[in-house]
């Protein structure tokens, strides 16, 4: 049975999360609240919320866990060509934390293959905006001709980045933002991005699964490190335009 957490109840051990033979593998607990303090505690333990309107807040710690190592990011020839074009053209920009709430709302509205509705509820937007105000959530945004056309957002503690969602209004806009994030994290020496769940899109970009135990051990170490800076622009993309960067076709985004 999934435990119900009251306002002052701690998270149970992640080993108590439901297993693969259940209908909800990785489900750890449920609660009525999504307070910033609870959200921070969750991320520091390798736990994340994922639920829909009308449901209680559901907390997850799946095993295995999908991650992306920045050094293993794959760049397709077509994306490499796009990045070169973005670097040359002044109408293309990469902005950081310029419109965090707007990126979240755009992610909530983006259609997802095989999904109805959105898990990015008004409550989720409020909670993550609070993390953004405290410097623990960030948006990486692709702009063209002064208009935001794609981006992503996630949570950051110490030397760990937890990816949440991305969207694109024009072709490759989300990939440009992700590539900029990857290039920046490479510069900073970050070793892992949490991707939460396995998708063909993430796998095509170099994502892979690791055991939950290994993931949580890395999180505990990484979040204890000093935070990295979050100021960069599209110039970081130059590091990904070498022909040595390779990749495969892409699929569904979260």
From Swiss-Prot:
NCBIfam families xrefs: aat
Species annotation: Burkholderia orbicola (strain MC0-3)
The name this protein goes by in its record: Leucyl/phenylalanyl-tRNA--protein transferase
Job description of the protein: Functions in the N-end rule pathway of protein degradation where it conjugates Leu, Phe and, less efficiently, Met from aminoacyl-tRNAs to the N-termini of proteins containing an N-terminal arginine or lysine.
HAMAP family: Leu_Phe_trans (MF_00688)
Enzyme Commission number(s) of this protein: 2.3.2.6
Reaction it catalyzes: N-terminal L-lysyl-[protein] + L-leucyl-tRNA(Leu) = N-terminal L-leucyl-L-lysyl-[protein] + tRNA(Leu) + H(+); N-terminal L-arginyl-[protein] + L-leucyl-tRNA(Leu) = N-terminal L-leucyl-L-arginyl-[protein] + tRNA(Leu) + H(+); L-phenylalanyl-tRNA(Phe) + an N-terminal L-alpha-aminoacyl-[protein] = an N-terminal L-phenylalanyl-L-alpha-aminoacyl-[protein] + tRNA(Phe)
Organism lineage string: Bacteria, Pseudomonadati, Pseudomonadota, Betaproteobacteria, Burkholderiales
Record's keyword terms, sorted: Acyltransferase, Cytoplasm, Transferase
GO molecular function terms noted in the UniProt entry: leucyl-tRNA--protein transferase activity
Subcellular location: Cytoplasm
């Amino acid at each position: 049975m999934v435990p119900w957490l009251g306002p002052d109840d701690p998270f149970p051990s992640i080993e108590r999360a439901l297993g693969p033979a259940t209908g909800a593998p990785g489900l750890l607990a449920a609660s009525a609240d999504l307070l910033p303090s609870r959200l921070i505690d969750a991320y520091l333990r390798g736990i994340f919320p994922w639920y829909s309107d009308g449901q209680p807040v559901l907390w997850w710690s799946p095993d295995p866990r999908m991650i992306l190592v920045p050094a293993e990011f794959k760049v397709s020839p077509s994306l490499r060509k796009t990045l070169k074009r973005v670097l040359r053209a002044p109408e293309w920009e990469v902005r950081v934390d310029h419109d965090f709430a707007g990126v979240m709302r755009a992610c909530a509205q983006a259609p997802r293959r095989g999904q109805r509705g959105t898990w990015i509820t008004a409550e989720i937007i409020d909670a993550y905006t609070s993390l953004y105000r405290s410097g623990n959530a960030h948006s990486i945004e692709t702009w063209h001709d002064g208009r935001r056309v794609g981006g992503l957002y996630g949570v950051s503690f110490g030397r760990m980045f937890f990816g949440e969602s991305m969207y694109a209004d024009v072709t490759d806009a989300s990939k440009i933002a992700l590539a900029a994030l990857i290039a920046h994290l490479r510069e900073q020496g970050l070793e892992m991005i949490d991707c939460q769940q396995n998708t063909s899109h993430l796998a095509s970009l170099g994502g892979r699964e690791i055991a939950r135990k290994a993931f949580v051990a890395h999180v505990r170490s990484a979040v204890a490190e000093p935070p990295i800076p979050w100021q960069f622009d599209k110039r970081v993309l130059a590091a990904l335009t070498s022909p040595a960067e390779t990749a495969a076709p892409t699929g569904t985004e979260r």
